[in-house]
């Protein structure tokens, strides 16, 4: 039986490498990145040029779209000139080439301003004394977007563009509002005890998206591990996709 062909745009970054390493044994994986990497399955192209990337979409089952400047502190000029165009081009190339599904790497920063409100501000500050983690109101994907900067605005644009291509062209687009993923694969500050997405759970989430039913045409999902102080709702990730996180950031508490 032939393996599904998976294309990862922006494949040479941290998240791209985690996903590539985590799924390569199950799928035929090729990557695109503007950086020239000494890997025969990664091709050096720039996603801001539709003509450059289009040939690589032929025969692909699922695209994992990571191509963007990953810094949450990127100025609007970078988001406008790079991230928006990369996202739109990926969706357009997918439709033009008959790709079935795009997994769009959105971000928790599309709703980051909720962290100014209680109880979320107390959680990300580590002020747990007056909180009952068992009864926290969770932030759901049907709540209004509240971007916390140009980067978050760009991710909200990507979700909207994905909805358009899904409705207009029948493309399946699954948007992942990814939590905290870092090289160390552990919490590095107090906020991360709520927001960590471990490398292993990231791979689990991506595989669940790849294998989700074909009739799942659009969805927005938070990507986070099963952390005690998690305040993003992942019930739709579990119900729609079968995502089952295994890790909890509390395992790192008081280990330093």
Predicted feature descriptions by range:
Residues 167, 177-185, 196-218, 226:
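Alpha-helical substrate-binding/gating segment
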């Amino acid at each position: 039986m032939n393996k599904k062909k998976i294309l990862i745009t922006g494949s040479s970054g941290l998240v791209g490498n985690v996903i590539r390493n985590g799924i390569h044994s199950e799928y035929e994986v090729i990557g695109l990145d503007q950086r020239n990497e000494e890997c025969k399955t990664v091709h050096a192209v720039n996603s801001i040029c539709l003509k450059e990337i289009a040939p690589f979409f032929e025969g692909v089952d699922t695209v994992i779209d990571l191509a963007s400047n990953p810094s949450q502190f990127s100025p609007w000029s970078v988001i406008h000139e790079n991230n928006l165009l990369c996202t739109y081009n990926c969706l357009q190339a997918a439709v033009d080439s008959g790709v079935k599904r795009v997994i769009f790497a959105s971000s928790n920063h599309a709703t980051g301003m909720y962290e100014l409100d209680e109880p979320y501000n107390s959680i990300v500050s580590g002020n747990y004394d007056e909180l009952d983690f068992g009864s926290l109101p969770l932030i759901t994907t049907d709540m209004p977007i509240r971007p916390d900067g140009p980067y978050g605005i760009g991710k909200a644009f990507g979700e909207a563009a994905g909805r358009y291509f899904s409705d207009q062209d029948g493309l399946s687009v699954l948007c992942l509002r990814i939590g905290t993923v870092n090289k160390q694969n552990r919490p590095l500050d107090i906020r991360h005890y709520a927001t960590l997405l471990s490398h292993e759970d990231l791979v689990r989430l991506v595989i669940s998206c790849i294998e989700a039913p074909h009739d799942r045409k659009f969805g927005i999902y938070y990507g986070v591990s099963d952390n005690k102080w998690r305040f993003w709702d992942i019930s739709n990730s579990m119900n729609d996709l079968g995502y089952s996180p295994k890790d909890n950031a509390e395992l790192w508490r008081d280990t330093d």
